[in-house]
Structures are given as structure tokens and as C-alpha cells.
């Protein structure tokens, strides 16, 4: 198992609040080629665990592979972790044994016959940084493009994505109407949503197309009930689409 993730970190030496004071779009246009998420260590560990939870509970994932969107992908931290999880899982599927990233985080064994994962990434600002890190380009769709249903269908027979992962970005949609239109558009094209971020925002309402989901029990939660899974100050929240009832 020789594959290793990239852990380099380069970014502006100010708090994100200071950076965003000039405008979110302005900031990311300035740093788009060199952007790095300073929370990558916690994000990686948390996402590895979430993917294992997802594997344990989602039968479609086990039967036809994973079709995933890395939304607002930045320099590819989420994509890199998904690639790492798949690589380690396939190594286990071939050679057997067990692999723990650390005591409480185990990678699942992926059967060799499972099709390769489909990974689509998009970010309007960080194409250069993403390409440098992952080795292939991302799309350049922004949140408004998603709301306008410009996201291409997945390669699955029904064109649906299994999972959309939005990391450290959804809370930047501060206008409720834009948040609604983006989330609702995703809910008709993606079965599950995983939101990663530094806190519990934003709260997604059921009428926006998503039901909050308990990561540990894998059961629905009522609106407003806390369901964050937290590791090293990074929060994860799962949501299930209300518009794809076979999800």
C-alpha cells in the first residue's frame, strides 16, 4: 500500500474572516492557483470515516460503485481523500487483512469486481490548484450554475450521483434564496449530501430537498436536531434527498 496523500499547505497568513472581508469571490480569484485548506488533516480523517459509514449502510454503493461530486473542490482535498479511500479499499479487497488510519478509523474492503468510482469535481476559482494536485482538471461550475441545473449527469444508468460532498463552502451561500435553489437542484440529481465545514452552518430545511441523517445510527432526524460528526474541529453532516425516494 504505497499510495500516500499530499499534505502540503500554502495559503494566505490571515484568518478566513479577514480574507473574506474583501469579498469571497475576490479572495478566491486571488489565491485560486495556490489555495490549500488549512483543515486538511481533520477533513481527511473525518471523510475517511464518513466514507466507511456510507459503505456500511448504502447497498447501491456496494453494488454499482460510487458516483460522487466534489462540489466547490478547492485544491482537491476531498477528491484526494476519496481516491485514497478507494485505493486502500481495493488493496484490502485483493490482499485481505485490515487497515486502520488510526484506532477509530477503519478502511473497508472493496471487492475487485466493483467498477471504478466516478469522481466529478467543480470549482469556479481553483482549476489550477486542483489540476496540480489531482492531475486532472475540474469543471468550473459555481453555485449558481448548479442551481441552474448545469451539472452534467453521472455515468450511472439513471444519471444520478450517489454522493455530493461540499467541503468548507456551503456556508458561504448566505442568501437563503440562493442556498435553497442550489440545494434543491442537487436534491434531484444526488441521493446523498455530505457537508463538511468548520461549524454547524448552514441549516438545511426539509423543503429544500434534504432530510438530516444521523451518521452513527443511519436514521433520519427531525429538522433542527443536531447531527454533527466532529473530528479535530471539522464538522460532518449527512443529508438524504427527499426527491429521490429510492435513495
Swiss-Prot record:
GO molecular function annotation: methyltransferase activity
A GO cellular-component term linked to this record: nucleus
Domain of life of the organism encoding this protein: Eukaryota
Name of the protein in its database record: Uncharacterized protein C17A5.05c
